[in-house]
Amino acid sequence: MVTKTLSVLFVASEVEGLIKSGGLADVAKALPKALQTLEQDVRVTIPAYRNIPNIDSAEVILSTELDHWPHTAYQVKKLSVEGVQIFAIECAKYFDRPEMYAENNQAYADNGERFSFFSTACLDMLPKLAFQPDIIHANDWHTGFVPFLLKSRYQQHDFFENTRSVISIHNAVFKGVFAYDELQCLSEMHSYNVPEASVSDTHVTMLKAGVMCADKINAVSPTYAEELKTELGSHGMAAEFQHRSADLFGILNGCDYGAWNPETDAFLPRKFKATKHSMTRGKSACKQKLQQDVGLPVTDCAVYGMVCRLTNQKGVHYLLPIIEQFLKNELQIVIVGTGDPVLASQLKELSALHSDKFSFVEAYNNELAHLVEAGSDFFLMPSEFEPCGLNQIYSMAYGTLPIVRSVGGLKDSVNDYDQEPEIATGFAFEEPTPQALLAVLHRSLLLYAQNPSEIKRVQLYAMQQDFSWEDAAEEYLAMYHSAF
């Protein structure tokens, strides 16, 4: 165990408990909290978006401006999430908007400028607040310029002389590609062509800037770290990840068992623990409540749940062609999610045709998400790619067996029943096709129908797995120390 206390600034575009659009927010809450439990000195900084609760009345701890960002004042407001201090950077010009990144599925045209400003302000505020971090931990493209600016501008100052940077890659699809002329306030981008960030003579990518300039890089699972070194897995940045291979770590995300625990979950009609009797009765009560809430007949058939963004990344396009064939069996499917309107329309049509077996809820509701995790027998994650994934970990905690494609963090966290029955925690397939998904669905259903006691054994084993953030935080600490 690494014992030396480090000061860490965790820089993210969102954090669960204040504002969230995806899994990054979960990590931005849970990892700093776990690091703090390990007696590290941690702060989190995010933009002060309009929709953060009570942001207007939050304490202002700094009012200043960026000297080289003309006429742009900003404030830092102090918030807290479960004991972790949050620095929220407020600048109405950039963050007083209805949404975080986009409106009506259209990204804000000045996102490059917005998050360049945020990255710069993150560094500018630190001497003024007298918080001197050993590690600045950036996340994804939004904060990719933090390691770049630290290296190119700020590290020449005594205050930052011993500060090191890390960047986490949660999803390399989104790179933050912008034209040089969209970033006019970053003089470094105009005094010379920046090889660390450039993708052409006219454009830079913020993610590449972070990857090439950070002292250490981590992917959110060991398999994803390997996938990033391929063109397919990195979505066009294989050369950069290969170049930085010696500094690339793969650390599997943890699970926030405070929020996802069937023994304490307030959303469940009956709580349960990892014993055969408790799990059987608890999951039965949760299944009945789930069926009632989504309008399906209350029966003891196998229930397959799915909670996701409706995108091809999540494998919805593998599921759609084979749903009707699979529904010919004695089972039910519940899908909860929002996203691509074309996929949503197709799911609505299918649920209308098979209303006794298939329910599609076009919404995200936290209570319903918990009920799907607890009341389903199987949880669908047939992802095209999945850097880490969290729902498969939540599912196991609730004795719901994940059915996954063997990629990224899904491969690292789920043991396939056919490959390793004694230590199985779910079912997996590899081929990215609807037919491969259908085959694994039939495998799971066959075991459910023919060997109920074996299903219960696997469910109980899955419930006993531990993906704690404390273990992950120990790995992050080791990576931080390796940066010096």
From Swiss-Prot:
Highest taxon of source: Bacteria
UniProt xrefs under InterPro entries: Glyco_trans_1 (IPR001296), GS/SS (IPR011835), Starch_synth_cat_dom (IPR013534)
Gene transcribed to yield this protein: glgA
Residues binding ADP-alpha-D-glucose: K20
GO process annotations (BP): glycogen biosynthetic process
A GO CC term attached to the entry: cytosol
Purpose of the protein: Synthesizes alpha-1,4-glucan chains using ADP-glucose.
Organism whose genome encodes this protein: Vibrio atlanticus (strain LGP32)
Protein name as annotated: Glycogen synthase
UniProt catalytic activity: [(1->4)-alpha-D-glucosyl](n) + ADP-alpha-D-glucose = [(1->4)-alpha-D-glucosyl](n+1) + ADP + H(+)
Protein family (similarity comment): Belongs to the glycosyltransferase 1 family. Bacterial/plant glycogen synthase subfamily.
Single Gene Ontology MF annotation: alpha-1,4-glucan glucosyltransferase (UDP-glucose donor) activity
Matches recorded under Pfam families: Glyco_transf_5 (PF08323), Glycos_transf_1 (PF00534)
Pathway per the UniProt entry: Glycan biosynthesis; glycogen biosynthesis
Entry keyword set: Glycogen biosynthesis, Glycosyltransferase, Transferase
E.C. designation(s): 2.4.1.21
